[in-house]
Design a protein with these regions (language model features):
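Short beta-to-alpha linker loops that shape the active-site pocket of alpha/beta-hydrolase fold enzymes
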Residues: 70-77, 142, 226
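Alpha/beta-hydrolase active-site loop
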Residues: 81-104
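C-terminal catalytic histidine-bearing segment of alpha/beta-hydrolase fold enzymes
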Residues: 212-256
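Active-site-adjacent alpha-helix of alpha/beta-hydrolase-fold enzymes
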Residues: 197-218
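The feature captures the conserved acid-bearing segment of alpha/beta-hydrolase catalytic domains
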Residues: 147-150, 155-203
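Short, surface-exposed "cap/lid" segments of acyl-processing enzymes
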Residues: 25, 32-72
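Primarily recognizes the serine-hydrolase "nucleophile elbow" in alpha/beta-hydrolase
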Residues: 100-153
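N-terminal cap/lid segment of alpha/beta-hydrolase-fold proteins
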Residues: 1-34
């Protein structure tokens, strides 16, 4: 097989953006080696891949092949609770398809890094759902309904359509409490801040019990921040360090 020429000193090759399942954009950043470990990366809510390319590039410098996704604001701003479960199912199916393709090309290791909404999507992509994802970073976490309810614009859209927080929590119970199946040997870290008003640190612990019962090693780390956005940015900046912490063959890395 002929190797493509390197297009950047940061990543080996950047494929043009393509629409994934359900129309969400997917962009791929190849490492120099085709057998490099792959990180699936989902952007924060309302954030484009281009906006967080700097974080993807930092992972590329460490030799990772990155497959990045973004989701439209419609997932919350349309005021339709059915969009979120559909988006999760579509992204999960696309990830499985990409894993099958990459495995056929010689890749043997897959992990993830998700921020904000992206973190929650990955919460529904581990265990029996996508068993190849053995390690990953949840950059913020907690209850999705309460987090969305704290977004003024999204809350108004749902209230206008007759939704209350209690009804929304019931509608999203299936994705808030997924059946993980087997997580034996998996390693995950949740990143958050006490000052994050959308997804605060103390909202994470109630959702970790089922992961641990399924066999996963799960830790929670606090980053210095003053709100949700700065929490996300702090986690993205430290992405290489957090990834190194959960990769079994690598162990903790120096602070960056």
């Amino acid at each position: 097989m002929i190797r493509r020429p390197a297009m950047s000193g940061i990543v080996g090759f950047r494929r043009p953006p393509v629409p994934g399942a359900a129309g969400f954009p997917r962009e791929e950043f190849e490492a120099v080696s085709r057998a490099s470990p792959v990180i699936f990366f989902i952007c924060p809510y309302g954030t484009s891949i281009s906006t967080v390319r700097w974080a993807i590039q930092r992972l590329g410098r460490d030799g990772f092949h990155v497959v990045a996704y973004e989701a439209a604001k419609a997932v919350f701003m349309d005021g339709d609770p059915e969009i979120l479960p559909g988006l999760i199912a579509s992204v999960r199916a696309d990830i499985k398809a990409q894993i099958a393709r990459l495995t056929s090309e010689g890749v043997t290791e897959f992990g993830f890094f998700g921020s904000s909404l992206g973190s929650f999507i990955f919460y529904n992509c581990v265990g029996d759902a996508v068993p190849e994802l053995r390690w990953g970073v949840f950059n913020t976490g907690g209850g999705i309904a309460r987090g969305m309810w704290r977004l003024d614009g999204a809350r108004r859209q749902h209230v206008m359509r007759g939704w209350s927080l209690a009804r929304l929590e019931a509608a999203w119970a299936g994705v808030q409490y997924p059946e993980f199946g087997h997580l034996d040997g998996c390693r995950f870290v949740f990143v958050s801040s006490r000052r994050d008003k959308i997804a605060p640190l103390d909202n994470i612990e109630p959702y970790l019990g089922s992961m641990r019962q399924a066999g996963a090693q799960v830790s929670v780390l606090e980053v210095p921040a003053i709100g949700h956005f700065s929490t996300i940015v702090a986690g993205l900046w430290r992405a290489p360090r957090f990834v190194a912490m959960v990769r079994p063959a690598v162990g903790p890395a120096p602070a960056r």
